[in-house]
Amino acid sequence: MGRRTPISNRLSIRRRVSAADVVVGFGVVALLYGITRVGESLSVNVTPGSSTARLPTGLSHLPYYAACSLLRMFVALGFSTAFTFIYATAAARMRRAEMVLIPVLDILQSVPILGFLTFTTIFFFRLFGNVVGLEATCIFAVFTSQAWNMTFSFYHSLTTQPRDLDEAARLYRLTKWQRFWKLDVPSSMIGLVWNAMMSMGGGWFFLTAAEAITISGRNYTLPGMGSYIGIAIRQGSLAKVGIAVVVMIIMVVGVNAVFFRPLVAWAEKFRMEDSASGDKPKSFFLNLLRRTDFARFIGVVTKPIGRFLDRITRPFGLAEYPLAIDKHRQRRGDFAFWILIGVVVAWGANNGLDLSLIHI
C-alpha cells in the first residue's frame, strides 16, 4: 500500500493554482500571442517604389494598431534603459569620459526629436532594406524622446550616492557587476522609474511623425495608432480621430495600471529616507502578482543566469574606486586625454572638409 500524502500537503498543493495564477497565466499567454501577431508584420517587404500609406482605417483594425504602437513604445523603452545603464555608468565612474559624455548628452537632449529622422531614416532603410528598417527608424525616434531624460536621472543618482553605501560596497568586496545590480540600480530605482514613466508619456506625442515616414518623396506608413490618426486627419474624419483618441487614452491608462503603477509601488522598498512616506503608492496588479507563484518562478529561472554572470564578470575586478588620487598623475592623464580628443576632432573636421570639397 502506497504512502498517502498528508491532508495539509494536499491542500497546499491545491492552493498553488489559484484564481490569481489563472488570471496571470492567461495574461502572459495573451501577451505572447499579441507579440507574435504583431511580429508577423515584419515579414512584409517594403521597397522604395511602393507606398504603404493606404492603411485600412476600419474600427476592427484598431486593436492591432494599438498593439503595434505599444510594442514599439516598450521596445524603445527597453533600448532606452540599456543605454541609460551603460552611458550613465560610464559617465559617473570614469572622470575623463564624464567630461565628454555629459556635454554630448546635453547636446543630444537639445536636438529636436524630429531632427533625428532626417538622417536616421535613410540609414536604417538602407541597413535593413525592408520594413524592419522603417520599424527601426520609428523605434529610434521614440528612443530619443525617452533616453536622455532617463540617462540624466540615473547619472545624478550615481553621483549623489551616500558615502556609507559606498563604504558598505567596499566592505563586502562586491565586484563591479555586483555593485551595479545590488547598489547602483536599487539606489536609483525610484528616480529611474518615475523618469521612465515621464519619458514614456512624452513618446506618445511623436508616434504620428514616427509611424509616417517620407523617403525619396514616397510616404511609408507603419501600422499603428499614430499613423491611423494621421490618415484620419487627412481624410477629415473627426469621428475616427475621436475614437482613436479614446483608444489611446485607454492605452495610456492601461499601461499605467498594469506596468508603471506596479513598478512605482514596488520601487518604494528601495527608498532610503529615514522617515517613511505617509502615503505609499499601491497597486492592485502588483498585489495580484504577489498572490501568485509568478515572481517565484521568475526567480528560479533567472537565479542560475545571475550566478553565471557573477562568475564571468569577476575578472573585471572589485568595485574599489580609489579614495586618494595622485594629482600630478591625474594632470598628466588629463593632458594626454585632451590631446587625444583634439586629434580626433581635427581628423573629423579634416574629413568633413574633404567631403564638402568633393561635393562642390
Residue ranges and their predicted role:
Residues M1-G78, V245-I358:
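N-terminal, non-cleaved signal-anchor transmembrane helix
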Residues D106-S145:
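Generic hydrophobic transmembrane alpha-helix motif, especially the helices
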Residues A76-L105:
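Transmembrane-helix boundary motif in ABC transporter permease subunits
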Residues A67-R72, A76, L105-Q109, T159, ...:
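Alpha-helical transmembrane segments of multi-pass membrane proteins
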Residues R72-S80, T84, L114-T118, P186, ...:
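Hydrophobic alpha-helical transmembrane segments in multi-pass membrane proteins
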Residues V132-S199:
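Membrane-cytosol interface at the C-terminal ends of specific transmembrane alpha-helices
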Residues N195-F259:
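Non-cytoplasmic
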Residues Y64-C68, M99-Q109, I122, H156, ...:
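Short amphipathic alpha-helical coupling elements at transmembrane boundaries
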